Amino acid sequence: MLNDSSNSTLRRLASQVALAVAVLLIGVKTWAWLATGSISLLTSAADGLVDVLASMVTFAGVRYAGRPPDQGHRYGHGKAEAIAALIQSILLAGAAVGLGIESIQRLFVPQPLTEMGLGIWVIIGSTMAAAGLVTMQTYVVKRTGSTAIAADRAHYVTDVAVNIAVLVALVLERFLAWNRADSIGALAISCYMLWNARGMALHALVQLLDSELDMSERERIQSAVLGCAGVHGIHDIRTRDGGDRVFVEFHVEVDGQISVEHGHDIGDRSENAVKALFPAADVIAHVEPVGIQDERLDDRVK
């Protein structure tokens, strides 16, 4: 994974490119919708508008999240990305509901389409552009772990699926004269958008509610610490996903007869062992003598 400065630069670049592509696609799709009258193209254009708004939210969230810790936010600003992702999910869900209602109305009152050849070529070009953007965002997410870019990527994965559905609907309507294919395609797209919004919201809430890392990750932390020389035990492991980094705290047990300096060195080694697992991590080890009887978080957590 890249260092914090490179991560921040890469996230900003990805959000800027996404915003530029989204603005271009919504303009082209709106023009095609006006020319054809296709409700599925309207759905795709509206999804593009959500993409523009979402990319703006993402850009703002990424910029704020990239700020270093300050006096008022000593844990940093990483949760801004999760907030941006949650806002995106709300925008996507709202668009899905509105377009779903319009699609159902068109099912009962079909409307003739025009210039479908133009619409087909516009959708093919839009699909290629969205697929290229998804490829770039996938790379950025793998390198940085950005929640906001991942949420933005989910929008454009949806956009690819939306465009394919629109393409199928227009082809069926033009070549097989299925006059409800356009409305059915739009309704299917709306349902997919709503499902995608649900997943985005749940993922954002995991960070906002300070959910623990997976048990497998906690077991890796425990194994890494227990593998350090001088460590006799570990308990009260506490973790949370902060968006651009993870936060890990634990109590490490050492021989009670050693010096404070020696115990401090063991604590540092255990922290470094965890940082080796999570390069973008804040790790705090509390050193205490082995066998001490005290109140433990492990005993309170059910």
Predicted regions and their residues:
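Alpha-helical transmembrane segments and adjacent TM-loop junctions that form the membrane-embedded core
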Residues: L2-V23, V28, L34-K302
